[in-house]
Structures are given as structure tokens and as C-alpha cells.
């Protein structure tokens, strides 16, 4: 293995188009010793996050911090492992899902857009969970085998699957409830819809008309084409006001949807925002609006429905449960597009367009 590797580095504050540079002189992390439980992951795919693309244009580089390598979630294979690493992660070539701690990315620059990562064992899990299988037809009778989860799909499952799982729990979605998913064709939204259906909820998905078949295929009972309605809240009120939703899961970040929610959301039931926002909004205006939604009492003009702003760090143990759902045939992960490492800027353009159906990935190896 070479002593250096390629990676994308943020050189200064500014839009990703001007602040990122691909270099080939990053040091390859040293092999863990016999007393370490760390894993060296040879990165195959990196999943891109909308929030990280936005943050690069806002936050300055921290004093004395090394150049920042962005992104946190990857899939790949074990290159080497420390002597105290879990047995299932020691074999070189083992396919894994992994992530770096977001604070480590911000403070120490240890992000994912590079060829190799050294990670603590708690941030790495094997891709295949062999204890779970699904029954399939076989020429010689019935056979059981795990539903395949590819490295690409696995990379797309880590952050978005964790976010979807946490949002559904935060809304306490239960069997028989009616749920509105805004942005049902997105990287998080299409997983949210499936998890709600898995709990027995009736799901209405909002997306553009070209995504109708996609949205229905990934869990929605009904579809609303927002492009056909100049005033979406008015349409929702007239169509669903007599049968309000038990919760609204907003994967887009629509203030109008929340401001008008008493017209189509049951009293005491929440709108949960996954932390979505517009690239055109300033950080201060976004934070101000989120704060007003969360804390402003109704007697001061606040909306009389709970507002939950949800943002979470991916939970690798939670990811394991999602991997099991995929292997059992209960969950599907859609990849919007894959880009070569050299085409990161084009990939971020796709992410920030908010037109991606599913996850956008960078292919490293």
C-alpha cells in the first residue's frame, strides 16, 4: 500500500465549488497495532449530505485545525484491523458499513472523502448479517438466503436510514394512523415512507408528478403532486381537513406546511422536520424560524401544533436493524446516482438541487 492517498480537502470557507480541492498527498493511516481495536477501511462509496454541502459555505475553518476532509458515511472493505478488533471485522476484504464522528470531522478534519479511513470499532459494522434470511423460490424446492444489500445501497442507508428511523420514532407512528410525508421521493423520505408502512400506518406522500410511480413503489398509499397546486396547504386543507393526519414528517423544510398545519393535522400531534432547510436561507434566519416554531407560545402567535426539529448522529446499532430489514425484504434503498471521485462538484450540485431520488454517492474504489 502506498504511503499517500487521494482525498478531497476543504481549503477555506466558501461554497463547495470553490473551497474543495482533490489532492493526492494525504497520508494513509497507519495500521493498527496488536493492542488496538481500530479498523482500516478501504472506502468504496461515500454518501453525500445536503447539510455538509451547506455548512462548508457558512462556517470558517477552526483555528489550528487541519484541512477538513468532508462527509461522514461510507461503505467499503476491511484493509487491516487491530489485534483487539471484533472477530467479524478482522478479516481483510470483509464488506462493511462505517462512519466517522461528525465532531471529529469538524475539529480534526477526519472526514470520509478519501481512499482509506481509520475508525474505532464502534463505528464499523459488517454489511452482511447472516442470521436473518428470506424464503425464496428455488428450482429444487424452497431455499432461504439473505436479501442482498450492495455496498452502494449500504452507504446510502447509514445516515438516511438512521434519520428516517429516528424521525418515525419521534412522531410515535402507530398502526392505523394517517401520516403525511413531505419529500417522499428524497433520500430520507422514501425510507420514512417504508418505515411508516411497516408500522401499519396509512401514508400520503408529497413529491413532484414525475416521481409518482417511485413514491408509490416505496411505500406511499396516496400521492400528492405539489407542482399541480400553487397553494399546497390550501389543497391539503380542502382534501384532508375532514380526516386530519396524525403526524407530518417534513423531509423538505416547508414553513408554509407547518404554519397552516392546524387545518390538516390533529390537535396535539406533531410536525417533525428532519433538519431540512433551503440553501437560499441564511443560517440566522433558519435558526430563528426553527426557534420560533419550537418555542413561541400560541398566545404570541405560535402555531398550535407541536414542532419537532430532529437531527441525529447516525447510530450504527440502529443501522444494523435496518440492514436486517433489507435482508428480510422489508425495506428497499434507492440510489439516485453515482459519481466518480473526480466529479464531486457535479455530485454536490445534484444533492443541493433537491431533485435527487434517493442517495447520491461518490465511488472511490
UniProtKB/Swiss-Prot annotation:
**Which residues are involved in binding NADP(+)?**
185-188, 226, 274-275, 354-355
Question: What CDD domains would the database entry show?
Answer: MDR1 (cd08267)
Q: Specify the species.
A: Acremonium sp
- Whichever gene encodes this chain, its name is pydE
Name of the top EC class for this enzyme = oxidoreductase
Q: Which SUPFAM superfamilies match?
A: GroES-like, NAD(P)-binding Rossmann-fold domains
Which pathway?
Answer: Mycotoxin biosynthesis
Q: Where is the Enoyl reductase (ER) domain?
A: 21-362
Name of this protein: Medium chain reductase pydE
Note whether Nucleotide-binding occurs among the keywords: yes
| Record family assignment | Belongs to the zinc-containing alcohol dehydrogenase family.
Record-listed E.C. numbers: 1.-.-.-
Q: Which GO terms describe its molecular function?
A: nucleotide binding; oxidoreductase activity
- Main function: Medium chain reductase; part of the gene cluster that mediates the biosynthesis of pyrrocidines, fungal natural products containing a macrocyclic para-cyclophane connected to a decahydrofluorene ring system that show potent antibiotic activities toward Gram-negative bacteria. Within the pathway, pydE functions synergistically with pydB, pydX and pydZ to form the cyclophane.
- One GO CC term on file: mitochondrion
- What InterPro entries does the record point to? GroES-like_sf (IPR011032), NAD(P)-bd_dom_sf (IPR036291), PKS_ER (IPR020843), YIM1/Zinc_Alcohol_DH_Fams (IPR050700)
Subunit and interaction comment: Monomer.
Checking Pfam families in the record gives: ADH_zinc_N_2
Could you list this entry's UniProt keywords, alphabetically sorted: NADP, Nucleotide-binding, Oxidoreductase, Virulence
State the disulfide connectivity. none
Amino acid at each position: 500500500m502506498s504511503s499517500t492517498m487521494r482525498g478531497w480537502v476543504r481549503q477555506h470557507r466558501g461554497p463547495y465549488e470553490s473551497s474543495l480541492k482533490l489532492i493526492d498527498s494525504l497520508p494513509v493511516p497507519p495500521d493498527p497495532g496488536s493492542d488496538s481495536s481500530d479498523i482500516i477501511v478501504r472506502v468504496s462509496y461515500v454518501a453525500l449530505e445536503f447539510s455538509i454541502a451547506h455548512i462548508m459555505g457558512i462556517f470558517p475553518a477552526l483555528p489550528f485545525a487541519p484541512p477538513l476532509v468532508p462527509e461522514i458515511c461510507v461503505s467499503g472493505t476491511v484493509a487491516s484491523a487491530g489485534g483487539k478488533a471484533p472477530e467479524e471485522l478482522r478479516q481483510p476484504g470483509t464488506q462493511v458499513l462505517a462512519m466517522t464522528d461528525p465532531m471529529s470531522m469538524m475539529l480534526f478534519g477526519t472526514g470520509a472523502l478519501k481512499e482509506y479511513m481509520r475508525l474505532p470499532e464502534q463505528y464499523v459494522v459488517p454489511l452482511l448479517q447472516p442470521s436473518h434470511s428470506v424464503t425464496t423460490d428455488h428450482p429444487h424446492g424452497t431455499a432461504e438466503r439473505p436479501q442482498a444489500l450492495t455496498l452502494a445501497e449500504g452507504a446510502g442507508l447509514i445516515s438516511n436510514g438512521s434519520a428516517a428511523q429516528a424521525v418515525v420514532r419521534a412522531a410515535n407512528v402507530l398502526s392505523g394512523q394517517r401520516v403525511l410525508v413531505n419529500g417522499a421521493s428524497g433520500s430520507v423520505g422514501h425510507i420514512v415512507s417504508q418505515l411508516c408502512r411497516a408500522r401499519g400506518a396509512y401514508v400520503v406522500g408529497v413529491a413532484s408528478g414525475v416521481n409518482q410511480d417511485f413514491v408509490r413503489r416505496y411505500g406511499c398509499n396516496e400521492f400528492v403532486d405539489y407542482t399541480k397546486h400553487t397553494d399546497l396547504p390550501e389543497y391539503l386543507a380542502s382534501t384532508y381537513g375532514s380526516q386530519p393526519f396524525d403526524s407530518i414528517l417534513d423531509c423538505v423544510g416547508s414553513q408554509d406546511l407547518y404554519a397552516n398545519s392546524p387545518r390538516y393535522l390533529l390537535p396535539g400531534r406533531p410536525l417533525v422536520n428532519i433538519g431540512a432547510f433551503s440553501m437560499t436561507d441564511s443560517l440566522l434566519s433558519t435558526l430563528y424560524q426553527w426557534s420560533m416554531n419550537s418555542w413561541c407560545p400560541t398566545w404570541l402567535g405560535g402555531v398550535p401544533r407541536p414542532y419537532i426539529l430532529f437531527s441525529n448522529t447516525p447510530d450504527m446499532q440502529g443501522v444494523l436493524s435496518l440492514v436486517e430489514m433489507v435482508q428480510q425484504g422489508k425495506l428497499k434503498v434507492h440510489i439516485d446516482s453515482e459519481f466518480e471521485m473526480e466529479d464531486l462538484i457535479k455530485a454536490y450540485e445534484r444533492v443541493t438541487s433537491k431533485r435527487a431520488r434517493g442517495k447520491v454517492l461518490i465511488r472511490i474504489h
